[in-house]
Regions:
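Hydrophobic alpha-helix immediately C-terminal to the catalytic Tyr-X-X-X-Lys motif of short-chain
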Residues: 187-191, 195, 242, 302, ...
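N-terminal Rossmann-like NAD(P)+-binding domain of SDR-like oxidoreductases, especially those catalyzing
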Residues: 1-214, 378-380, 388
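Short, solvent-exposed loop/helix junctions and linker helices
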Residues: 6, 117-120, 181-182, 232-236, ...
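C-terminal substrate-binding subdomain of Rossmann-fold SDR/epimerase-dehydratase oxidoreductases
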Residues: 246-389
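A short C-terminal helix-loop "cap" of Rossmann-like NAD(P)-dependent dehydrogenase/epimerase domains
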Residues: 54-66, 160-171, 211, 215-217, ...
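Glycine/proline-rich active-site loop of Rossmann-fold NAD(P)-dependent oxidoreductases
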Residues: 186, 198-201, 213-240, 248-250, ...
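Short-chain dehydrogenase/reductase
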Residues: 123, 127, 192, 239, ...
């Protein structure tokens, strides 16, 4: 299968490319390196050093014997997207190329607008390129469980069968996202569903939970194949952040009561889910939705798990919640679709957390401690960037 990965230089895009390549698929990458630019803007860098994309691709060719063409450009340039899709002629497009941080989108007006422009316009350009070139191309799009919010009912996988005043229908599950980033993902989902309905496109929307981890089977093969590890208050996911705080001897900072419950997933399972979705494509005209996570935990449960696993003393500190969200709520989400396709989950365990501790210990001199604390407050319309250059 010919697979085009949008955002192929990113935290998830790069290990996904390796995972698909080693399993016999022809893979090409698209990126504009804006994620690396955001490191400069924020004054913080990946905990684990990451090579340039040129060096990564060259190393992969040496290690595996497999080449991966690279296209450099911005998905907001619709003509360029058309050109890339025509040139590579993929069977599947995996779309990671979006600004992925809720706090970043809530910094101020400029960052909110940039997030929505990048994410929504870029995805629209991809949809138009598929419709113009080959409507059989399968779009595998990374969404987020954050689209749903925390409703007081069970969350279904994308669609809801309902009966209202004696009539029945099937509708998209109601969305109540908690940031301008999450809203951009909702807009994407609606746009993709509409494109499937009017153009007969085939798409799989993967509403992913909070990702943790840094290593996959393929990234371990050479240091130049490593993917990034973000721990800061803007891009760092909660488990990655807690492991850094534990290693540094800092309290694990839980926002508010800590009852915020989310689906979580190991990065090893993320790449597995993408492959399973790509190898079992949606049918023409289908907007298929899977909830992509393997277990659900509250923030406090995650903190307690990390604290119990760390060999030293680790305290848990409750801090004022910078976000506007429910801190104690019902949460139960369906996630059987990917299991039915063959997903074998890697659940959170002491062994896995120990591996994160080792990564953090190995690179702790690269940590900027001031970048860990939250500085973006949802109720403010202008936030300062701590540590920015």
């Amino acid at each position: 299968m010919r697979i085009l990965i949008l955002g192929g230089d990113g935290y998830l895009g790069w290990p996904t490319a390796l995972h698909l390549s080693v399993r016999g698929h022809d893979v090409a990458l698209v990126d504009n390196f804006v994620r690396r630019d955001w490191d400069q803007e924020l004054g913080v860098e990946s905990l684990v050093p990451i090579a340039s994309l040129e060096e990564r691709v060259r190393t992969w060719a040496t290690v595996s014997g497999k080449e991966m063409p690279v296209y450099i450009g911005d998905l907001c340039d619709g003509d360029l997207v058309d050109q890339i899709v025509r040139d590579y002629d993929p069977d599947t497009i995996v779309h990671y190329a979006e600004q992925s941080s809720a706090p970043y989108s809530m910094l101020d007006r400029r960052h909110a607008v940039a997030t929505q422009m990048n994410n929504v316009v870029g995805t629209l350009n991809v949809l138009y390129a598929i419709a113009a070139h080959n409507r059989d191309i399968h779009l595998v799009k990374l969404g987020t469980m954050g689209e749903y919010g925390t409703p007081n009912v069970d969350i279904e996988e994308g669609w809801l069968d309902l009966t209202h005043r004696g009539r029945q229908d099937r509708v998209l599950f109601p969305k109540r996202p908690g940031s301008f980033y999450h809203l951009s993902k909702v807009h994407d989902s609606h746009n993709i569903e509409f494109a499937c309905r009017i153009w007969g496109l085939r798409a799989t929307d993967l509403n992913q939970g909070v990702v943790y981890g840094q290593e996959t089977e393929e990234t371990r093969l050479h240091p130049a194949l490593a993917t990034r590890f973000d721990y800061d208050g803007i891009f760092g996911t909660v488990l990655n952040r807690f492991t850094i705080q534990a290693v540094l001897g800092h309290p694990l900072t839980v926002y508010g009561q800590g009852g915020q419950t989310r689906g979580i997933i190991n990065i090893v399972d993320t790449v597995q889910c993408i492959r399973l979705a790509a190898e079992s494509p949606a049918i023409a005209g289908e907007f298929r939705v899977f909830n992509q996570f393997t277990e659900q935990m509250s923030v406090r449960q995650i903190a307690e798990t990390v604290s119990a696993a760390y060999p030293g003393d680790v305290s848990i500190e409750q801090v004022e919640n910078p976000r506007v969200e429910a801190e104690s709520h019902y949460y139960r989400a369906a996630h059987t679709g990917l299991l039915d396709l063959g997903l074998v989950p890697h659940l959170l365990s002491d062994t896995l957390i120990d591996s994160l501790f080792r990564i953090a210990e190995r690179h702790k001199e690269r940590v900027s401690p001031e970048a860990i604390r939250p500085t973006v407050h949802w109720r403010a319309t202008a936030n300062a960037l701590a540590g920015a250059q």
